[in-house]
Amino acid sequence: MRPARRRFGSVRARQGFVYDDGFMDARTSSAGEDFLAPVVNFAMRHPGRMLAIVLFAHLVVWTALPLLTSANLELDLAEDLALGKEWQLGYWKHPPLPWWIADLFYRVSGQIGSVYLLGPLAVIACYVGVYLLGREMMSGGQALIGVLGLVGIHYYNYSAVKFAHDQMQLPFWAFAALFFYRALVRGKALDWLLAGAMLALAFWSKYAAFVLALTMGLFLLFDPVARRSLGRAGPYLMALAFCVVIAPNAWWVVESGFLPMQYVGHRAKVAQRAIEFVTLPTVWISSQIFFTHPTLILLGVTLFPRRQASAAARPSPEQAFARRYAAVMALGPFALVTAIGIVTGRTPVAMWGYPLWIFMPLAAVLWFGPVVDALRLRVFTIGYVFLFLLGPAIFIGTFISDHYSRARPKATEFPGAAIARHLTREWHEKVGTPLTYVAGTEFAANSVAVYSPDRPHVVVHGRPQFSPWIDMADLRRRGALVLWEEGLVAARPDEWRATFGAQGEPALLDVPRATSRRTAPVRIRYWIVPPQP
């Protein structure tokens, strides 16, 4: 039976696959009694089920590992819970959505450790979005390969345990690209509206979504098929949906004097010499090659040398459009970030590459696939399993080796709970009221805010200008705990003494780190600033 047809610009596209993978059981059964054959057959017949199995394993592994090895929350997770409860429309360095989500998870579960679910869940949602986009372009089996190829990029496994803005943006990038493609192909108003909403939510997650929006805009302008949509209402519906959803945060950004943009400017290293206009971009590009090289190798050994039939086949108009779209989504944001860095003389931070590669395997399969013969499927399966197991092995190996060789303290060994209990108890004994406000160096203050039973509000960096939720008059009436790790450059005790009215010399608290290895204790200096009449 011929599949239903739908509009594709001014051409016609099939409802279903841009191309079929031509897979048949016989192609893998030729592998004889190879134990991989049943797995490959199942994956090709039921790609959605296989994806669900893989994603469940991903969730279990990358939630359990940090829970079992971390005595204290990671830096980002502590910040999530410390600041998310303030429910601001924006914060001094990032948009608020990840912190809101973390606070909701904590409120629902009542467990601090529940936030370790969020990073893997964000990656899973991203994978689903990429898979659905792949299903718009090709068969389920090929779309599955386009998703599972991401296994070799540490952003989506090893680093996913640190849920914050980098992880939160992933699903919205994927779904924005999905609905934008559907809108271009089908022309339905709902797809245009959803594309705009998803793009806005990507901005609510991290302002790096600017490069995704710019990529989409350039594709709409310069692709000959996509450009035809400009004569219809769709792109303007997308823009309207985007503006409506982003409006509250955009208003906050303007009212704050563009504080987050200042933070980004401070984070990116500025070229000081002429040679650095070459070396800094080279470092950035090299970092992305390093982070993606396992996936590049996996795709290389799977897709090359190309099948003669695939290399010689002339793509249909539908397939050509899908290839262009996937290639632009896979490489466009990276090219724009690199170009902006070169023009401005600033080098992007390596971790800014987080969302840039989610479409790379999908594009590779579209351009150089399909992967249909038994040998290539077996090679991909073996490579995938190896890389899937390699991530946890490196995580566990690093955890064990750090016990013997690491000199620098780890955030997950910070005794946040012990510090919070001690200082909260001392506050109650000396002041007799709940601890409402805490200020000081970032990690120490955030840890007290998370682990103290009083859940105090944080004055970020001890600076009220970064903390608009703080009423300084109320702070003076209730008092504040000011603390910092001794020896940190970020500590500003003289400034904090003036800001909070602290008196006398700060007290000293030594707390052993939450580890059995021999290491120096955490030295906390602090003031208990009592309520003022």
Whereabouts are the PLM-identified features?
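Transmembrane-helix motifs of polytopic, lipid-linked glycan transferases
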Residues: 117-138, 175-179
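Membrane-proximal, lumen/periplasm-facing interface regions of secretory-pathway glyco-
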Residues: 346-350, 372-435, 441-458, 463-466, ...
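Short acidic/glycine- and proline-prone juxtamembrane loop motifs at membrane-interface regions
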Residues: 158-169
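Transmembrane-helix signature of polytopic, membrane-embedded enzymes
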Residues: 39, 130-152, 170-171
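Short helix- or helix-capping micro-motifs
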Residues: 55-58, 146-154, 199, 203, ...
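Transmembrane-lumen/periplasm boundary regions of multi-pass, lipid-linked membrane glycan transferases
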Residues: 201, 213-322, 333, 338
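Membrane-interface transmembrane helices that cradle and orient dolichyl/undecaprenyl
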Residues: 135-141, 176-193, 368
